[in-house]
Amino acid sequence: MSTLWADLGPSLLPAFWVTIKLTIYSAIGAMIFGTILTTMRVSPVKILRTLSTAYINTVRNTPLTLVVLFCSFGLYQNLGLTLAGRESSTFLVDNNFRLAVLGFILYTSTFVAESLRSGINTVHFGQAEAARSLGLGFGATFRSIIFPQAVRAAIVPLGNTLIALTKNTTIASVIGVGEASLLMKATIENHANMLFVVFAIFAVGFMILTLPMGLGLGKLSERLAVKK
């Protein structure tokens, strides 16, 4: 056990810190892009509705692993897209990290969009009609009346999406991002006789990340619940 901890201990917190950074950056990007997709999805412009619907349905039904691999092999290795300076000594590490974040954003934003759309469906259509009767256009109505209520109603599904994103960050290891699951794999290879102990350590680590998140968002949902 002491040998295991001597190998694992110094790397454990840095690996989970990478997981946390992946989650935070991806969540921010997914919220922004997901909001854009939602706006397009409910837009009166047919082409925008068609494009957003096609994107959401396509990406939601594509395995996340393929999306991340596409960002790495398709965008970087085939098209030459880089998200870090080549002159940097940490180019490969930074580039793989940012490509993973991009993949998570592209994928998770579709679930954010659907969560927000479910929130929009809870807003009585009469409010939009009343806004239009007062001369407000789609943009003003959506921004000032519909969207704020939709966010409040969608906190629980958005929270579930965030928790799923935290667990999905383990897929970043397929392109060499040094997050928690990559460390777990390396540790198991070096300490196969401690398999269940290693699993337990990393399971507890992810529970520490996700349980407070779920409880906090549940409390927030109760406080901000839309009163019927």
From Swiss-Prot:
Its main location: membrane. It is a multi-pass membrane protein. Disulfide bonds: none annotated. Gene3D superfamilies: MetI-like. Disruption phenotype: Deletion of the gluABCD cluster almost abolishes glutamate uptake activity. CDD domains: TM_PBP2 (cd06261). GO terms for biological process: amino acid transport. It is found in: Cell membrane. Part of the ABC transporter complex GluABCD involved in glutamate uptake. Probably responsible for the translocation of the substrate across the membrane. Belongs to the binding-protein-dependent transport system permease family. HisMQ subfamily. The complex is composed of two ATP-binding proteins (GluA), two transmembrane proteins (GluC and GluD) and a solute-binding protein (GluB). This is Glutamate transport system permease protein GluC. It comes from Corynebacterium glutamicum (strain ATCC 13032 / DSM 20300 / JCM 1318 / BCRC 11384 / CCUG 27702 / LMG 3730 / NBRC 12168 / NCIMB 10025 / NRRL B-2784 / 534).
